[in-house]
């Protein structure tokens, strides 16, 4: 248990423990402005001793980035709301990274803020051989890279402790990573290392503007919401080709998204995706996926009303073995903002179990 509550330094910031709040979409910021309820939501988790808050996805400042209503953004009128959130979280002793998000292929025509703007993807694909979006031109690619960079500069200026790029689950950066949605024949497509270039350019250009001391994380996944069986890398060797360009570009930490953290990534080893990522990259990694629960999030969509809490002994054993460095907790923190504190004090019988109503309260 001690390893879970041992401080860790990411770049130049020290986190009080190894627990992050996983980013979870909320859709509770009308006109993209996070209000008092959003501040209270994050402050409660920070007061409950979460070491690092990773916010819900925040839209990149371009109309093609939006895929859902009432998602926060970084327009000027949102500045005050973000500053209030940052102050509230930091006053509780926690750190906070916003997750910078472009939905890519998940955007449907007719959505706000401009119904005429389609979804943007590398090759106009939402899935392998399924056309459903605008195929980005070279000019589109350049423009969106600059949109990401401008937002990262603003994120630092607002006072956040770092930033996470959402490169997982079938959204735009992941659309570039995955060969199923990236069939480009220019420098942004092709072999696995070339498919990282979009993300690498964002990171490299941001580094030139913000310096080396501001933490940049990237979340990635093998699975996609379009295809749960999809993989970016089928072997450790392919994973290395994927990771190392991102390391060289200036990433500080990898957030490796699994649906179930205990599942091994490749045959012949018990290491999960975060474990392999740490072994290959040498950088700190965050694991995630049904922490503290007995089943993954898919049950929510299948009508599952409740999920039984699960022991975290295996998680602690893996952390003790230094398989990964941090743990992101999602649904368990929705149901119980004091989950971290109760775990630290070994008050397991007082943890509030997750029920679907907690997800509904977050979404609606």
Locations of regions flagged by a protein language model:
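Flavin-dependent oxidoreductase catalytic cores
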Residues: 1-364
């Amino acid at each position: 248990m001690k390893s879970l509550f041992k401080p860790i330094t990411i770049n130049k910031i020290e986190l009080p423990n190894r627990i992050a709040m996983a980013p979870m979409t909320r859709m509770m910021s009308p006109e993209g402005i996070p209000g008092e309820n959003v501040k209270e939501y994050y402050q409660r988790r920070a007061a409950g001793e979460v070491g690092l808050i990773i916010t819900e996805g925040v839209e990149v400042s371009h109309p093609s980035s939006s895929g859902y209503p009432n998602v926060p953004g970084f327009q000027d009128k949102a500045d005050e709301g973000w500053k209030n959130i940052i102050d509230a979280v930091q006053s509780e002793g926690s750190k906070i990274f916003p997750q910078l998000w472009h939905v890519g292929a998940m955007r449907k025509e007719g959505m706000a803020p401009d119904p005429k703007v389609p979804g943007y993807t590398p090759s106009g694909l939402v899935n392998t051989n399924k056309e459903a979006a605008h195929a980005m031109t070279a000019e589109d690619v350049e423009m969106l890279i600059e949109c990401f960079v401008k937002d990262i500069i603003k994120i630092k200026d607002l006072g956040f402790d770092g930033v996470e790029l959402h490169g997982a689950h079938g959204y735009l950066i992941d659309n570039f990573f995955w060969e199923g949605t990236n069939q480009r024949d220019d420098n942004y497509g092709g072999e696995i290392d070339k498919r990282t270039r979009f993300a690498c350019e964002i990171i490299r250009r941001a580094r030139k503007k913000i310096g080396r001391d501001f933490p940049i994380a990237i979340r990635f996944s093998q699975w996609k919401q379009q295809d749960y069986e999809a993989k970016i890398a089928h072997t450790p060797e392919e994973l290395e080709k994927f990771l190392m360009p991102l390391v060289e570009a200036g990433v500080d930490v990898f957030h490796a998204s699994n649906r179930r953290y205990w599942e091994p990534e490749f045959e012949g080893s018990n290491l999960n995706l975060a474990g392999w990522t740490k072994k290959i990259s040498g950088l700190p990694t965050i694991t995630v996926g049904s922490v503290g629960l007995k089943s993954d999030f898919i049950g929510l969509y299948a009508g599952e009303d409740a999920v039984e809490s699960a022991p975290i002994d295996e998680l602690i054993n893996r952390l003790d073995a230094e398989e990964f460095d941090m743990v992101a907790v999602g649904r368990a923190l929705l149901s119980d903002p004091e989950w971290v504190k109760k775990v630290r004090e070994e008050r397991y019988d007082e943890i509030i179990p997750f029920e679907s109503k907690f997800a509904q309260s977050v979404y609606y």
